[in-house]
Protein backbone atom coordinates (compact mmCIF):
# COMPACT_ATOMS: atom_id res chain seq x y z
CA UNK A 1 0.00 0.00 0.00
CA UNK A 2 0.85 3.67 -0.09
CA UNK A 3 3.05 5.23 2.55
CA UNK A 4 1.35 8.18 4.24
CA UNK A 5 4.06 9.43 6.54
CA UNK A 6 4.07 12.02 9.29
CA UNK A 7 7.10 13.42 11.09
CA UNK A 8 6.83 13.70 14.88
CA UNK A 9 9.31 16.16 16.34
CA UNK A 10 10.40 14.75 19.67
CA UNK A 11 12.95 17.00 21.37
CA UNK A 12 12.88 15.56 24.90
CA UNK A 13 11.63 12.32 26.46
CA UNK A 14 8.25 13.81 27.39
CA UNK A 15 7.62 14.46 23.70
CA UNK A 16 6.98 10.75 23.28
CA UNK A 17 3.81 11.21 25.36
CA UNK A 18 2.25 13.40 22.63
CA UNK A 19 1.91 10.60 20.06
CA UNK A 20 -1.84 10.10 20.48
CA UNK A 21 -2.66 13.81 20.27
CA UNK A 22 -0.40 14.22 17.26
CA UNK A 23 -1.68 11.17 15.39
CA UNK A 24 -5.35 11.94 16.07
CA UNK A 25 -5.02 15.00 13.82
CA UNK A 26 -3.46 13.05 10.95
CA UNK A 27 -6.21 10.90 9.46
CA UNK A 28 -4.91 8.34 6.98
CA UNK A 29 -1.34 8.41 8.26
CA UNK A 30 0.17 4.92 8.43
CA UNK A 31 3.84 5.65 9.19
CA UNK A 32 5.20 7.93 11.90
CA UNK A 33 8.79 9.16 12.03
CA UNK A 34 9.84 10.32 15.51
CA UNK A 35 13.03 12.39 15.65
CA UNK A 36 14.84 10.09 18.05
CA UNK A 37 18.52 9.72 17.14
CA UNK A 38 20.73 12.82 16.92
CA UNK A 39 24.32 12.11 15.85
CA UNK A 40 26.44 14.48 17.92
CA UNK A 41 30.07 13.68 17.14
CA UNK A 42 32.34 12.44 14.39
CA UNK A 43 32.92 9.12 16.17
CA UNK A 44 29.25 8.20 15.67
CA UNK A 45 28.07 9.01 19.18
CA UNK A 46 24.38 9.89 19.23
CA UNK A 47 21.67 10.78 21.70
CA UNK A 48 18.49 8.73 21.85
CA UNK A 49 14.93 9.59 22.78
CA UNK A 50 13.60 6.17 21.71
CA UNK A 51 10.74 4.66 23.68
CA UNK A 52 9.35 1.12 23.66
CA UNK A 53 6.01 2.41 24.99
CA UNK A 54 5.81 4.79 22.02
CA UNK A 55 6.47 1.98 19.53
CA UNK A 56 3.92 -0.29 21.22
CA UNK A 57 1.32 2.49 21.29
CA UNK A 58 1.97 3.38 17.63
CA UNK A 59 1.65 -0.25 16.59
CA UNK A 60 -1.63 -0.50 18.54
CA UNK A 61 -2.83 2.53 16.53
CA UNK A 62 -1.94 0.79 13.26
CA UNK A 63 1.16 2.88 12.63
CA UNK A 64 4.58 1.72 11.51
CA UNK A 65 7.48 3.51 13.24
CA UNK A 66 10.54 4.61 11.26
CA UNK A 67 13.03 6.17 13.68
CA UNK A 68 14.81 9.26 12.38
CA UNK A 69 18.60 9.48 12.51
CA UNK A 70 19.72 13.05 11.91
CA UNK A 71 22.56 15.52 12.34
CA UNK A 72 21.08 18.99 12.85
CA UNK A 73 18.52 19.12 15.66
CA UNK A 74 20.86 20.17 18.47
CA UNK A 75 23.54 22.79 18.93
CA UNK A 76 25.90 19.99 19.97
CA UNK A 77 25.53 18.13 16.67
CA UNK A 78 25.84 21.26 14.54
CA UNK A 79 28.95 22.37 16.44
CA UNK A 80 30.79 19.05 16.95
CA UNK A 81 29.88 16.77 14.05
CA UNK A 82 31.99 16.64 10.90
CA UNK A 83 29.91 14.40 8.66
CA UNK A 84 32.78 13.74 6.25
CA UNK A 85 34.96 12.49 9.13
CA UNK A 86 32.08 10.36 10.42
CA UNK A 87 31.10 8.88 7.07
CA UNK A 88 34.57 8.42 5.54
CA UNK A 89 35.64 5.90 8.19
CA UNK A 90 34.54 2.36 7.35
CA UNK A 91 34.90 1.25 10.98
CA UNK A 92 32.94 4.24 12.31
CA UNK A 93 30.11 3.66 9.82
CA UNK A 94 30.04 -0.03 10.74
CA UNK A 95 29.95 0.75 14.48
CA UNK A 96 27.16 3.32 14.04
CA UNK A 97 25.08 0.93 11.92
CA UNK A 98 25.55 -1.91 14.42
CA UNK A 99 24.44 0.35 17.27
CA UNK A 100 21.39 1.49 15.31
CA UNK A 101 20.43 -2.10 14.50
CA UNK A 102 20.64 -2.89 18.22
CA UNK A 103 18.27 0.03 18.87
CA UNK A 104 15.79 -1.51 16.41
CA UNK A 105 16.03 -4.82 18.28
CA UNK A 106 15.56 -3.12 21.65
CA UNK A 107 12.62 -0.89 20.73
CA UNK A 108 10.93 -2.91 17.98
CA UNK A 109 10.45 -0.14 15.43
CA UNK A 110 9.94 -0.93 11.75
CA UNK A 111 12.58 1.10 9.95
CA UNK A 112 14.86 4.10 9.83
CA UNK A 113 14.58 7.52 8.26
CA UNK A 114 17.89 9.26 7.53
CA UNK A 115 17.94 13.07 7.55
CA UNK A 116 21.51 14.31 7.16
CA UNK A 117 21.49 17.98 6.21
CA UNK A 118 24.04 20.67 5.40
CA UNK A 119 26.59 18.20 4.06
CA UNK A 120 29.59 19.55 2.22
CA UNK A 121 30.25 18.14 -1.25
CA UNK A 122 33.29 16.15 -0.08
CA UNK A 123 31.06 14.22 2.34
CA UNK A 124 28.65 13.17 -0.42
CA UNK A 125 30.25 9.91 -1.63
CA UNK A 126 30.84 8.78 1.96
CA UNK A 127 27.24 9.53 2.92
CA UNK A 128 26.02 7.51 -0.06
CA UNK A 129 28.25 4.62 1.05
CA UNK A 130 26.71 4.86 4.53
CA UNK A 131 23.24 4.63 2.95
CA UNK A 132 24.35 1.54 0.98
CA UNK A 133 25.65 -0.17 4.12
CA UNK A 134 22.62 0.89 6.16
CA UNK A 135 20.40 -0.53 3.41
CA UNK A 136 22.07 -3.95 3.63
CA UNK A 137 21.76 -3.99 7.42
CA UNK A 138 18.10 -2.97 7.24
CA UNK A 139 17.27 -5.60 4.61
CA UNK A 140 18.93 -8.28 6.74
CA UNK A 141 16.57 -7.34 9.60
CA UNK A 142 13.45 -6.72 7.54
CA UNK A 143 13.54 -2.98 8.30
CA UNK A 144 12.54 -0.17 5.94
CA UNK A 145 15.11 2.50 5.02
CA UNK A 146 13.93 5.93 3.92
CA UNK A 147 16.07 8.99 3.20
CA UNK A 148 15.09 12.67 3.32
CA UNK A 149 16.53 14.86 0.58
CA UNK A 150 16.59 18.45 -0.57
CA UNK A 151 14.72 19.50 -3.68
CA UNK A 152 17.08 18.50 -6.53
CA UNK A 153 19.48 21.25 -7.57
CA UNK A 154 23.00 21.50 -8.91
CA UNK A 155 24.44 22.40 -5.50
CA UNK A 156 23.04 19.24 -3.87
CA UNK A 157 23.89 16.84 -6.72
CA UNK A 158 26.55 15.17 -4.53
CA UNK A 159 23.72 13.61 -2.47
CA UNK A 160 23.50 11.27 -5.51
CA UNK A 161 19.75 10.75 -5.41
CA UNK A 162 19.97 8.24 -8.27
CA UNK A 163 22.13 5.87 -6.18
CA UNK A 164 20.00 6.51 -3.09
CA UNK A 165 16.96 5.50 -5.12
CA UNK A 166 18.60 2.19 -5.94
CA UNK A 167 19.54 1.23 -2.38
CA UNK A 168 16.91 2.91 -0.16
CA UNK A 169 13.27 1.86 0.03
CA UNK A 170 11.99 5.46 0.01
Give the predicted meaning of each segment.
Residues 1-6, 16-25:
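Non-catalytic propeptide/linker segments at domain boundaries
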Residues 25-26, 167:
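Short, conserved loop/helix-junction motifs that constitute active-site signature segments
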Residues 2-13, 38-170:
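Chitinase-like catalytic core of GlcNAc-active glycosidases
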Amino acid sequence: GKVRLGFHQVTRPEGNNTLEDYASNARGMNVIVPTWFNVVSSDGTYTSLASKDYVDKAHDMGLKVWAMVENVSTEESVKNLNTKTLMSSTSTRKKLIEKLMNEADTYGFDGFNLDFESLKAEAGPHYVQFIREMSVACRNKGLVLSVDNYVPSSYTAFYNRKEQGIVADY
